[in-house]
Amino acid sequence: MRSSLIAAIALVALAGCGRITPATVTDPAEVQRLARITVPPSAAGLQCRTECGIDPLIYGRFYIPTADLRAVLDRMPKDCKIEPYSKYSNVTSHQMSEPWWQPGQIREPQVAEWSEPGFSVNLMFGEAGQPGILTVYFFNFGL
């Protein structure tokens, strides 16, 4: 009897060690709430996933007309600046498994990164395809 109980506990523990597929978020309002960024009504191609580990994580991508970038950055603190990408960003330092996660395809990427109490916002954006359309990647997490 005792060996059956130990085997059952071991089986449950091993089942919990498998890879869990990140949850998909499709509602722009929910993405805004979780990522703490604005997703403009003009956004297209929204992809978003969440993971819960030691720190909650939300990452994704969408396309916007260049003129709508200001709306995406509306929560950025005034003392933060848009910077040219200098070969490091929380966006590019993480290799996500989704086929749409390709920040390396952005030409002349720029980044905007800031923290607020208990949360880090990390954006990378630039043109990757059609002129006048920006691809915006975000990789945001709890601290």
Where are the predicted features?
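N-terminal export and membrane-targeting signals
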Residues: 1-9
